Swiss-Prot record:
Stretches of the chain found on the membrane's Cytoplasmic side: 1-94
Topology relative to the membrane: Single-pass type IV membrane protein
Name of protein: BET1 homolog
Annotated InterPro entries: BET1_SNARE, T_SNARE_dom
Name of the encoding gene: Bet1
Source organism (scientific name): Rattus norvegicus
Length: 118
């Protein structure tokens, strides 16, 4: 149903775009289309970047979980070793403790010497 006075939908005055000259209106539309396309490409770039960040965060969380479990197992291993050393130090085996310290000192010296030669 058409309203009275609107005719076929074109405004009066010979302008087809509600009082704007065709060239000015088309220029505005082209600029809007260009800006819209520019905005669309920026939004797409930001979306892909955020997806990549999400994947990286998931990978880093997985690596952190693996490191946490490895640290827990290492903590348990070191705790057992320290317990054994405490038992060894409580006993009257000072000779064995001295040998163990000399051996570890020798191993560190050999490692230092190997690294120094490189």
């Amino acid at each position: 149903m058409r309203r009275a006075g609107l005719g076929d939908g074109a405004p009066p005055g010979g302008y087809g775009n509600y009082g704007y000259a065709n060239s000015g209106y088309n220029a505005c539309e082209e600029e809007n289309d260009r800006l819209t396309e520019s905005l669309r490409s920026k939004v797409t770039a930001i979306k892909s970047l955020s997806i990549e960040i999400g994947h990286e965060v998931k990978n880093q969380n997985k690596l952190l979980a693996e490191m946490d479990s490895q640290f827990d197992s290492t903590t348990g291993f070191l705790g057992k070793t320290m317990g054994r050393l405490k038992i060894l130090s409580r006993g009257s085996q000072t000779k064995l403790l001295c040998y163990m310290m000399l051996f570890s000192l020798f191993v560190f010296f050999v490692i230092y010497w190997i690294i120094k030669l490189r």
